[in-house]
Regions:
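N-terminal carbohydrate-binding accessory modules
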Residues: 1-50, 63, 78-86, 416-417
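The substrate-binding groove and active-site-proximal loops of carbohydrate-active enzymes
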Residues: 11-32, 54-71, 118-137, 159-166, ...
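Conserved, mostly hydrophobic/aromatic
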Residues: 13, 43, 51, 80, ...
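Short, acidic/polar
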Residues: 21-45, 136-142, 258-268, 351-362, ...
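Carbohydrate-binding surfaces of carbohydrate-active enzymes
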Residues: 284, 300-569
Length: 569
């Protein structure tokens, strides 16, 4: 059961009226109010029931250190309420004002080299910094106190797409060393666990630890990524606790999750939230084919480079990942309105007729209770000026708006089905530790011979597509979400289990053996359990813990130069 208790499906778009407040007039020269009124008329006619606002404009809320401007949003919320539209209001901490960088240089995020991140982008701060949180607290508090009682507000988004980058500030590195002291107790314990005799890397003291910029040790890498994920989670929990004290009963707290951001553990982030909200961006046009057709060599997929997977199964996989974050239904706070291009990553692939509605219905079938597009207005400026919204640059309704309205009708037609719980005959263990390990030492290779950092996701989709093609539902469950004490119950619930865990604990491997002994059908992908959770290779005969049970083992493995059919289907 989700934290919110609304009935039916919700539908809408992110709405950034503030981006147009200095430029919008109609043909008669009227002010912004005319444009705003037209927007809400179009929203109401198209079936919008939710908008998301306010999360990207800290400088609009707080133009100067001691000056706040809070009233500009009220007319938008009033009009939303008058039209029966609920609002998710965001805290603006992911896009910081220039004055923060100038007045507080110590909060600027650092690259691995130690150089500060240049201004001009977003998510460019060290959010573990006490000083940064002290800057965040007043603007968060002012916004929430001002609008928590507004009748349009249904929920709050804290930050946005957290974990975008790895942080390398001195304070982050110091807290990393402290975490290693806590985990290993002594420097001898760390030296032994990580095998630091190799290449003369043994340390005299934790203060001797090298910076991550020069690291080549897999155990260091996994510990560093785990620490980054912990910092992201702590920042969200800090914001959640601050906001929780101020909001009205019945309002939920979420964040917009971009799955598998570098500084985040996707399957632990839900512990900080009342409800899961995600980006569901997918390849359109031929990128929604099934079975998945990989692009020809040298030809890019019909999606931005940061959408790593294509095919109809990839859309389902994203949704099942979203549902796995809290093992419950979820909200889609961003998805393709039209082409999704940003800066140098161009991907002008607007939907084929019918795909807009097809994708939305697909999301709902996998547990989405809100489908919200990014965004309402296509922007005339900024790096996302080619990111198509529901309305084009002209702000005149066109084909996308018509598809948007048509999809709302289709969703209303299935509201009577109630809260849908997707079927899941197959379970897949999702291992974030393995994702990180494969980014460094992946099982797959690129055409240039280098490791494919998307090895984990590509293998996951191949496994997922087998179930998808067979018409079987899939449940993704994080390695830390399993009840390792009840393999018998898990086998009764899930007839098949795919253990997609290159890095695995002894307890997880024992659970999988007990699951199979209880009658479950256990599937082991390549290199299952090959390393421990700390990245050190297991020395048992592979597959570790399963050779005797399977009656099969291996000592060698090979990359493939081209696909090879193992058997005919």
């Amino acid at each position: 059961m989700m934290a919110h208790e609304w009935s039916g499906l919700r539908y809408g778009a992110a709405y950034y009226n503030e981006y147009h407040q200095e430029r919008i007039t109609d043909e008669a020269g009227n002010e912004l109010a005319a444009r705003t009124e037209e927007d809400f008329r179009l929203m109401s006619e198209a079936g919008v029931t939710v908008i998301r606002v306010g999360e990207s404009v800290w400088a609009r809320w707080q133009p100067e250190p001691n000056r706040f401007d809070l009233d500009w949003l009220e007319p938008i919320l009033d009009r939303a309420h008058a039209n029966g539209i609920g609002v998710i209001l965001g805290t603006p901490t992911y896009a910081v004002p220039r004055w923060v960088f100038i007045d507080h240089p110590s909060v600027i995020a650092h690259h691995a080299t130690g150089a500060p991140v240049a201004y001009g982008h977003r998510q460019n701060v060290d959010y573990s910094s006490v000083e940064f949180r002290a800057l965040c607290e007043p603007v968060i508090t002012k916004i929430v106190e001002r609008y928590a009682s507004h009748p349009s507000i249904i929920g709050w988004q804290i930050d946005n797409e957290p974990g975008a980058y790895l942080l390398h500030n001195d304070g982050v590195f110091d807290s990393f060393k402290d975490s290693l002291r806590d985990e290993y107790g002594s420097i001898d314990g760390l030296n032994a666990a990580w095998g630091l005799t190799y290449w003369s890397h043994a340390l005299r003291d934790f203060e001797d630890l090298w910076r991550p910029d020069g690291n080549t040790n897999p155990s260091y890498l996994l510990a560093w990524r785990k620490h980054q994920a912990r910092l992201t989670k702590e920042f969200l929990q800090w914001q959640r606790d601050l906001v929780r004290k101020l909001i009205a009963p019945g309002q939920f707290i979420t964040t917009c999750v971009a799955i598998n951001r570098p500084g985040m553990d996707t399957f632990s982030i839900g512990e900080s939230l009342d409800a899961t909200s995600v980006n569901v961006y997918y390849a359109s046009q031929d990128g929604l084919e099934h079975p998945t057709r990989q692009p020809s060599p040298g030809v890019a997929a019909p999606a931005p480079i940061w959408v790593p997977l294509t095919g109809a199964s990839a859309l389902n996989l994203i949704c099942d990942t979203a549902r796995g974050i809290k093992q419950e239904n979820f909200l889609v706070t961003e998805t393709n309105g039209s082409s999704i291009s940003q800066g140098p990553a161009m991907a002008a692939f607007p939907h084929y007729p019918g795909q807009f509605k097809q994708a939305a219905l697909n999301m709902v079938s996998r547990g989405a209770e809100l489908v919200e597009y990014w965004h309402w207005h296509t922007l005339p400026y900024g790096v996302e000026n080619y990111w198509g919204g529901i309305l084009p640059h002209s702000l005149k309704p066109g084909r996308t708006y018509a598809q948007f309205a048509e999809t709302a009708v289709a969703l209303r037609a299935i509201e009577s089905l109630g809260r849908l719980t997707p079927a899941a005959e197959v379970a897949i263990v999702y291992s974030t530790s393995s994702l990180w390990a494969f980014e460094f030492q992946g099982s797959l290779r690129q055409p240039n011979g280098m490791v494919d950092p998307k090895s984990y996701e590509r293998t996951l989709q191949s496994l997922y597509e087998i179930a998808y093609s067979a018409g079987l539902g899939v449940r993704l469950i994080g390695e830390t979400q399993l009840d390792l004490g009840d393999p018998v119950g898990f086998a009764a619930q899930h007839p098949a289990l795919i253990l997609h865990a290159y890095a695995a604990s002894d307890e997880l491997l024992e659970f999988a053996r007990a699951y199979a002994a209880a009658g479950g059908r256990l599937i082991l992908p390549p290199r299952t359990g090959y390393v421990r959770l700390d990245g050190v290779m297991r020395t048992e005969v592979a597959p570790a813990g399963f050779a005797a049970v399977l009656g099969a083992s291996y000592n060698e493995y090979s990359n493939l130069n081209e696909p090879v059919a193992a058997f005919d289907v």
